[in-house]
Amino acid sequence: MFARLSLCAALFAGFAAVAPAAQVQGILIDQMCSSKAEVHIVAGPRLEGGMIVAEAHTRQCALMPACEKSGYGVFTYDNKFLKFDEAGSRKALAMLRASKKEDDLKVEVSGEIQGDTIKVASLKFVE
C-alpha cells in the first residue's frame, strides 16, 4: 500500500514539475543590450526604453563580440525580456549570421519557460 502511494506521489510530482511549452513572439536581442530596452523613468518625468528601442536594435550590434558572448533572448510585446538557454543562444547566433536582415528582428520562440529563461525548442524569424 505504501509503495503504491509513494509511486503515485512520485508520478504526480513528476507531472507537476513539467511546465507546458510556451510560444512567445517579440524581438531577438542580445542580453547585453536588453537592458537598454527595459522601460524606466527618467528626468522629466518620462519613460524610456520599451519595444521601440528593441525594434531599433540591429543585427550588426547583435553580432558584436561582446553582444555575442552575452547570449540572446526575446524582448516580448509586454516589455519583458526572456533569456535563451545556451542551446537557444547558439540557435539565435546561427540565425543572425545566416540572415540578411539588418533590423526588425521579430522572432517566434517556442519552449519551456523557467523563471526568466526560455529553454528554446524552436526559433524562427517572422514578418
PLM features: what roles do these ranges have?
Residues 20-127:
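OB-fold and OB-like single-stranded nucleic-acid-recognition modules
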Residues 1-2:
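N-terminal secretory signal peptides that target proteins for export/translocation
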Residues 6-16:
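Bacterial N-terminal signal peptides
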